[in-house]
Amino acid sequence: EGQAATTDVDVNAAYDGSGATYEAYKAFWNRDSYNNAGAALISSVHYSTNYCNAYWNGTQMVYGDGNVSQGCQPLARGQDVTAHELTHAVTENESGLIYSGESGGLNEAMSDIFGAFTEAYVDGGKTGTLTVSADTWKIGEDILAPALRYMNDPAADGASKDFYVAGVGNVDVHYSSGIANLAFYLLSQGGTHPRGKSAINVT
């Protein structure tokens, strides 16, 4: 960190997003990078053509440029996306959560949760205060409007699950993650199930 900006907006976004994610983990959890041993955070941008995705490949971040004609912006420009993918690296280093079935849903939820956390850290001015807004609970709202997923109301995307049922492990992990995402939202913010599937008010 600390280097001058380049002329490439997406290089700058990946650089700043990775830096903010590192800072958030360090400030709140005293974690030194994804391996807790100071590993460098490496990113590649402009991957492929019309590629609306980003991923952790086991050693570094990879960002597509999106597909603007279909409303998908360059992936490096989403702070929660960067933190989400880097959290996959943390999970890879710290847990045995395989990337399939119910375990995969928890893996994805962990990334969404820390994506939201890091966004709140940045919105709080990176001062140690978390600023939470309606956008905090939207995943990828800066990439594909109105959002990719909704932690406070997972079913709003038309696919994510918001309560446990038998066989949920057969659902795409990006959608089964909604169960843990909503649990985290309710634990941190309080309230009831957004679609009336429980009568318990979490306080």
Regions flagged by a language model, labelled:
Residues 1-8:
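Acidic/histidine-rich, surface-exposed loop or edge segments in extracytoplasmic proteins
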Residues 85-91:
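Surface-exposed extracellular loop regions of Gram-negative outer-membrane beta-barrel proteins
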Residues 8-80, 91-203:
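Zinc-dependent metallohydrolase catalytic domains
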